[in-house]
Structure formats: C-alpha cells, structure tokens
Amino acid sequence: MCGGAIISDYAPLVTKAKGRKLTAEELWSELDASAADDFWGFYSTSKLHPTNQVNVKEEAVKKEQATEPGKRRKRKNVYRGIRKRPWGKWAAEIRDPRKGVRVWLGTFNTAEEAAMAYDVAAKQIRGDKAKLNFPDLHHPPPPNYTPPPSSPRSTDQPPAKKVCVVSQSESELSQPSFPVECIGFGNGDEFQNLSYGFEPDYDLKQQISSLESFLELDGNTAEQPSQLDESVSEVDMWMLDDVIASYE
C-alpha cells in the first residue's frame, strides 16, 4: 500500500465535512509537523528517548554559565591559610613545600590576626613569590604567633673533618720500645724472665753500661770512662752480638 492510496481513501471524508473535494497537495500542506512525524513513525521514537533533549539543555546552560565573565567561585574564608574553630577562635597554618607538611602557626582572636600570621610565615618560606592576604601592609608578627621551624639547607652542613698528617720522623719517634728478653747465664735461675728495653736514642755506651750492671761487674767501671775499653774486652763478644742482634 502506498501513500497515494491512503490519501485517496482519506479524501472523501474530507469532502463530506467541508462540502468540497481536496487535492493531494492541499492535504499535504495542511498536515503539521507533529502529524507528519506521527505518520512516518518519528514521533513515537522521540517519546522513547526524552532524556536526550534534557541533556542537551543542561549542557547549553553549563556553557552559558562558564562563558559569563566576572563570576568566580566564592571562597569559604575571606583570607588565606585560616579557619574558624567551633568556639569562635581563628587558627592559622601554612604548608611547607620543602617538608611537605602543614605547619601550625597558632590560634588568634580575629581573622585579621590569623591572616597576618599567615603572611609572615609565607614571606619566610616562599619569599617574594608568596601570595599574601595583605600585600600592601608591612606589619610585625601578631601575638601568639609561632614561627615555622627552619629546615636545614645544603649550605648549612658542618665542615668536613680535617685529616691529620704525621711525618715519618714523628711516627718513628712515637713508636713504643719493645723489650728484649735476656737468657739466664750459668745454672742459676735468678736471671730468667728478665727483660731490658733499649730505646732507639740510647747510644752504644749506655747499652754496654747496662749490660755490665746486668752481669754484676764492678760498679766503678761504669762511672770511669777511662776504664770502659778494659771492661769491654772482658765481656764475651758473642753476648754483645746477641744484644745487638736483638736490638736490630
């Protein structure tokens, strides 16, 4: 069945109502847009998805609000870095970017005092880049203000420890003397486990005199330099060699 057949069937009814016969062109012109949509089935589909039109309207409203100049989001507090306590006091705090924590600045009676405390701390932490509540005012810190702790920088490191350099001569003099054990002579046991230390500064004469006293020779020979050569000849040479070898 085509569209022309439907119109031809519909035409006699119209002629009876109005008393004259209408053509197909007149019938098409009299049909409104809603009837045409209903005739071809478009009206029923729009009824099934009414949310599309609502979403389009909401997006249009949002775009208009975004494009309106001069309207900004209203801040909860008038000043930066402050908040009101339930009992009426005003607290001030600031975030330290170097430590990554919020630093407590104190509690104040008014919002202006808390805002000034924030400005002082922001100036110390961020310097000239800080966003202040009162950029045109130069004010001292308010009462009950707790300054933020200063974080150590790389330039404040303690100086490096100095390396102590000791010359070779000083190190040799500072070495302790090692005792030289002497072996007992004869069958007696009174000379065992005796030791005498010979330091590097002793000369040969002092070593010989100490050896003579160890052998219980005449005490006058150690006091008289003229008789030193005679006493040396009386000492066995092998014993003197052992002493010198142990010293080396």
UniProtKB/Swiss-Prot annotation:
Induction: By 1-aminocyclopropane-1-carboxylic acid (ACC, ethylene precursor), methyl jasmonate (MeJA), and Botrytis cinerea. Also induced by cadmium. SMART domains: AP2. InterPro entries: AP2/ERF_dom, AP2/ERF_dom_sf, DNA-bd_dom_sf, ERF_plant. One of its GO terms (molecular function) is DNA-binding transcription factor activity. Residues 60-79, 132-161 are annotated as: Disordered. The modification Phosphoserine is found at residue 151. GO terms for biological process: cell death; ethylene-activated signaling pathway; heat acclimation; positive regulation of DNA-templated transcription; response to cytokinin; response to ethylene; response to jasmonic acid; response to other organism. Mostly expressed in stems and leaves, and, to a lower extent, in roots, siliques and flowers. Its main location: nucleus. Gene3D superfamilies: AP2/ERF domain (3.30.730.10). Keywords: Cadmium, Cell membrane, Cytoplasm, DNA-binding, Membrane, Nucleus, Phosphoprotein, Transcription, Transcription regulation. Residues 78-135 bind DNA. Probably acts as a transcriptional activator. Binds to the GCC-box pathogenesis-related promoter element. May be involved in the regulation of gene expression by stress factors and by components of stress signal transduction pathways. Interacts with TGA4/OBF4, ACBP2, and ACBP4. This is Ethylene-responsive transcription factor RAP2-3. It comes from Arabidopsis thaliana (Mouse-ear cress).
